[in-house]
Amino acid sequence: MASLSMASVNVSFCHPLRSSSPKVSLRSSVHFATSLSSSHSISGLRAVLPLKISTVASPNSQKLHSFTVFAHKGYKMKTHKASAKRFRVTGRGKIVRRRSGKQHLLAKKNNKRKLRLSKMTEVNRSDYDNVIGALPYLKVNRKAT
C-alpha cells in the first residue's frame, strides 16, 4: 500500500518597523496508509522538510504565504497478465471482453452464431471491481453508460 505524508508551512511577513523578525508557523499533519504487507513508513516530517527554515522580511509584503509539500512513498501494483490479455478498454472507458464459445466445435454452429460470437461484449458492472483489481492501471470510466 502507499503512504502519503503532508506538511504545511505558513510564513507571514510583517512591517520591519513594527517587528524585528518574521513569523513562521509550522503545522503538520501526517497521514499513513498501512497494510499487513508493508512494514516501512515515513518517520515524521524530517524526510519532507529541511532542518532549518530561513525567511527574509520585505517591507511591502504583508501577505500570508503558504505551501503544501506532498511526499508519496509506495510500491507499484502488479498487473495480472492473463487478465490483461482478456480485457480491453474502449475509447469511452468501458471494459470489453471476447464472447465464449468460438474455440472448437464450430462445424455445428451456423455462420450467424459464429459472427455473433466473434464480436466483443461489455463486462457486467458487477464484475468491474474484479477486473480493476487485476488490472490496476487500466483507464476505466466507471460512469460510462
Curated annotation (Swiss-Prot):
Protein name (database record): Large ribosomal subunit protein bL35c
UniProt-listed Gene3D superfamilies: 4.10.410.60
Gene (UniProt): RPL35
Subunit structure: Part of the 50S ribosomal subunit.
GO molecular function annotations of the record: mRNA binding; structural constituent of ribosome
InterPro entries found in the cross-reference section: Ribosomal_bL35 (IPR001706), Ribosomal_bL35-like (IPR021137), Ribosomal_bL35_CS (IPR018265), Ribosomal_bL35_sf (IPR037229)
Outcome of gene disruption: Embryonic lethality. Embryo development arrested at the globular stage.
Stated family: Belongs to the bacterial ribosomal protein bL35 family.
GO cellular component labels: chloroplast; ribonucleoprotein complex; ribosome
Domain of life: Eukaryota
Keyword list, A-Z: Chloroplast, Plastid, Ribonucleoprotein, Ribosomal protein, Transit peptide
